[in-house]
Structure formats: C-alpha cells, structure tokens
A protein has these predicted regions:
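N-terminal glycine-rich phosphate-binding loop and ensuing alpha1 helix
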Residues: 1-54, 58-61
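Residues at the starts of beta-strands that form the adenosine-phosphate
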Residues: 2, 48-50, 72, 100, ...
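Structural beta-sheet core signal
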Residues: 5, 52, 103, 128-129
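Active-site metal-binding loops of divalent metal-dependent hydrolases
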Residues: 10, 107-108, 133
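Short, well-ordered coil/turn elements that cap or connect secondary structure elements
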Residues: 20, 45, 68-70, 98, ...
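Short phosphate-binding loop-to-helix
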Residues: 60-63, 67-101
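Short beta-strand-to-loop acidic/aromatic patch adjacent to the donor-nucleotide binding site
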Residues: 99-109
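Conserved core of the sugar-phosphate nucleotidyltransferase
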Residues: 111-140
Length: 140
C-alpha cells in the first residue's frame, strides 16, 4: 500500500521555526524529524511506498528522503505551493491516488498502532478516516 504525505507548505503559523525549514523537517525530538517519524510509523504499519509531496524547502525534504533506506520513498514537487493549500497539493499528487492509499498531512503525528487499527477495518468502508478530539481546550 502507498502513503502520500502532503508536505508542500511552509507552516507559517510556526514562524520563526519555519522561516527556512519546512515544518515536516522540524526535529521536536532532537534527532528525528517529523517526516522521519511519520515514515518510520508507516513502515511499521506495512506501508511499502511513500510519496512526499514537497514545495517550500524541497531540498531539505529531499535530503531527509535520500537518507531513508528501509522503505521506498520518493518526492513529488508542487510548483504552486506558495499559491495553494492542501487541496492544490492533492491535485499535484492526483496521479498517485490509484489503488489503496493513505493520505497524511505533513504535520500529523501518529503512532503505528493507530494506522494499523484504521487499515484493519479499511476493507469495510470506502473512505476510512481517523480523527481525534481534545477532551478540553486551552486558550490557544
């Protein structure tokens, strides 16, 4: 199964952290970027191919992708990233959306168990969706 990760945007709400670094390349755990975490969890879940749709900071994303060897990963460039949102990024990746696939935002953190649970029941539903809701909200 294929996973498509939408990582074309800059993540302006996280400025100044994302001024020159794409959001998916941030390393909140020190050594591991968000993108590396996502791909590792996808691999553990049985995903065998990952397409990362890039835009802002393409070279930084490409550098991370080139260092991954335990799963097939490639990039697809969205030249319209500065003019569009995730819908535009999906349009750029539309030819990748054949057969079963998982679509993930480039800043979505998840554990493999969540994806495995979703995939386990995927055959029963045409478009399974995993979502989470906070029990309470703070002032942000």
């Amino acid at each position: 199964m294929k996973a498509i990760i939408l990582s074309a945007g800059q993540g302006r709400r996280l400025m100044p952290l994302t001024e020159v670094t794409p959001k998916c390349c941030l390393r909140p755990w020190g050594d591991v970027s968000i993108l590396e975490w996502q791909i590792s969890q996808l691999a553990v879940s049985g995903i065998d191919e990952v397409v990362v749709v890039t835009g802002f900071g393409h070279d930084a994303v490409e550098e991370i992708v080139n260092g991954i060897t335990d799963i097939r990963v490639r990039t697809l460039y969205n030249p319209f990233y500065h003019l569009s949102d995730n819908l535009g990024t999906c349009w750029v990746a539309r030819h990748e959306m054949e057969g079963p696939f998982v679509l993930i935002n480039g800043d979505t953190l998840f554990e493999a168990a969540v994806l495995q649970h979703l995939l386990k029941d995927a055959g029963h539903y045409p478009i399974p969706l995993a979502s989470d809701q906070k029990i309470s909200y703070d002032d942000d």
